[in-house]
């Protein structure tokens, strides 16, 4: 299985500043020109919400302050400017190889 290592495990960011979350895959998640890395946001008591698919594509209805980048094994989620409603846990997920796997999560606190 592909192991996804997220960092940091938690971070606290001031309102209006930038939050950066990294995800490193144990092997490439690229295939045929695309990177099959996705990012989700989860708030307590709610199902995960898809933010970014294939590394850099913004899901419909998601604010443009969320952006994703990377390829191969190294990926980044940026949130800028951070808003209070962004307090949540964020997960990377690869969909290149079965079984699809998730990172262990990054908890974002807004200061």
UniProtKB/Swiss-Prot annotation:
Q: Which GO terms describe its cellular component?
A: immunoglobulin complex
Residue ranges, annotated region (Framework-2): 39-53
Q: List the disulfide bonds.
A: 23-92
Question: Which domain of life, per UniProt?
Answer: Eukaryota
Q: Where is this region: Framework-1?
A: 1-23
Region described as Complementarity-determining-2: 54-60
What keywords are assigned to this protein? Adaptive immunity, Disulfide bond, Immunity, Immunoglobulin
Positions of the UniProt region annotated as Complementarity-determining-3: 93-101
- InterPro entries attached here? Ig-like_dom (IPR007110), Ig-like_dom_sf (IPR036179), Ig-like_fold (IPR013783), Ig_sub (IPR003599), Ig_V-set (IPR013106), IgV_Light_Chain (IPR050150)
* One Gene Ontology term from the biological process aspect of the record: adaptive immune response
Annotated segments matching region Framework-3 = 61-92
Q: Where is this region: Framework-4?
A: 102-111
Protein name, entry field: Ig kappa chain V-III region PC 6308
């Amino acid at each position: 299985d592909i192991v996804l290592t997220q960092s940091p495990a938690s971070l606290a960011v001031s309102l209006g500043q930038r939050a950066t979350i990294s995800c490193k895959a144990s092997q490439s998640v690229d295939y045929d020109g695309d990177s099959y890395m996705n990012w989700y946001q989860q708030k307590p008591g709610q199902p995960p919400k898809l933010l970014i698919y294939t590394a850099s594509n913004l899901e419909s209805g998601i604010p443009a302050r969320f952006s994703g980048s990377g390829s191969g094994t190294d990926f980044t989620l940026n949130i800028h400017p951070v808003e209070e409603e962004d307090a949540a846990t964020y997960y990377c997920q690869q969909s290149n190889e079965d079984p699809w796997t998730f990172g262990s999560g990054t908890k974002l606190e807004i200061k």
